[in-house]
């Protein structure tokens, strides 16, 4: 109970100060007062097919490959982080691609970001290789049915299906994101790199640079940028310099192919003290 209260207090203080600690708690906070997002999340969380794929994603990634978490917790973290990045960019005057291109409105953009982020890793249920392609193929089977429960207009449901599939396919660092929404999902995927995500493979005996560098990351926060041209600032607090590998090789590659790289900067801290500012 004390641990729960402490976590809740940290999240609340961070939100009040304009800082958001990357954790599973973000998602619940970001959908408050948004019926469309709340409905969509409830459908996803109760959908047997979706939850089975997310469970199997961890069987494949964590148990068989000794990778870090790619299951339900990671999905919630990325979905919440993506909504936070979107809100920062909206507050800075950015127009979502979905709005600009006449596909939907701002709330539809939020839904695409949340669902794309939540579902981005389901392809790992089949195999890590080409999981972004497999994930899009799997999601194409059930997304229209889910969206038809939310939208009365079937054409809009299919248009938003395509946008969500683009987010899933584009989250791989080798694929360029072509929408603001997909770029945000990709960056949000990269910010889930704190030590908690690496605990499972580490406990199973994985001691490579990926595991050790992830264990060096103490916490990650998403905040408003200090400079006008970089509205999104990702603050990464490390125990030691090993964490730079995570920033450059994991997060950095995501940012570079996100199509929003010029609006994002990463501030690396070492035990709370300024260490380096990185722009990709």
Segments (PLM) and residue ranges:
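Short, positively charged and aromatic/hydrophobic N-terminal segments
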Residues: 3, 7-18
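N-terminal low-complexity or amphipathic/hydrophobic leaders
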Residues: 57-77
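Divalent metal-dependent phosphate-bond-processing catalytic cores, especially two-metal-ion Mg2+/Mn2+ enzymes
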Residues: 17-46, 64-69, 80-107, 119, ...
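Secondary-structure capping and boundary motifs in well-ordered enzyme cores
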Residues: 70-74, 104-111, 131, 160
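Inter-helical turn/loop segments and adjacent helix faces that build the functional surface
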Residues: 145-157, 175
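N-terminal glycine-rich anion-binding loops that anchor highly charged ligand groups
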Residues: 46-57
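Active-site alpha-helix of zinc metalloproteases
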Residues: 112-116
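Post-HEXXH active-site segment of zinc metalloproteases
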Residues: 130-140
């Amino acid at each position: 109970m004390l641990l729960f209260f402490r976590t809740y207090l940290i999240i609340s203080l961070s939100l009040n100060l304009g800082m958001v600690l990357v954790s599973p708690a973000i998602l619940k906070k970001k959908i408050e007062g948004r019926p469309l997002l709340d409905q969509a999340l409830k459908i996803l969380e109760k959908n047997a097919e979706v939850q089975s794929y997310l469970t199997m994603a961890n069987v494949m990634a964590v148990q068989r490959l000794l990778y870090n978490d790619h299951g339900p917790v990671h999905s919630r973290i990325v979905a919440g982080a993506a909504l936070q990045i979107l809100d920062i960019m909206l507050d800075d005057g950015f127009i979502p691609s979905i709005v600009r291109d006449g596909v939907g409105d701002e709330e539809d953009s939020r839904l695409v970001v949340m669902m794309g982020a939540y579902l981005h890793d389901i392809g790992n249920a089949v195999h890590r290789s080409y999981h972004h392609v497999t994930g899009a193929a799997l999601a194409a089977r059930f997304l229209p049915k889910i969206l038809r429960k939310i939208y009365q207009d079937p054409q809009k449901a299919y248009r938003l299906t395509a946008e969500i599939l683009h987010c899933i396919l584009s989250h791989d660092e080798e694929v360029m994101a072509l929408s603001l929404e997909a770029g945000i999902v990709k960056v949000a995927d990269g910010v889930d790199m704190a030590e908690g995500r690496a605990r499972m493979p580490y406990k199973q005996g994985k001691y490579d640079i990926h595991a050790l560098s992830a264990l060096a990351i103490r916490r990650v926060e998403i905040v408003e940028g200090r400079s006008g041209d970089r509205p999104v600032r990702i603050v990464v607090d490390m125990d030691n310099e090993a964490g730079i590998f995570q920033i450059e090789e994991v997060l950095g590659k995501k940012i570079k192919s996100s199509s929003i790289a010029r609006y994002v900067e990463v501030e690396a801290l070492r035990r709370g003290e300024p260490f380096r500012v990185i722009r990709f």
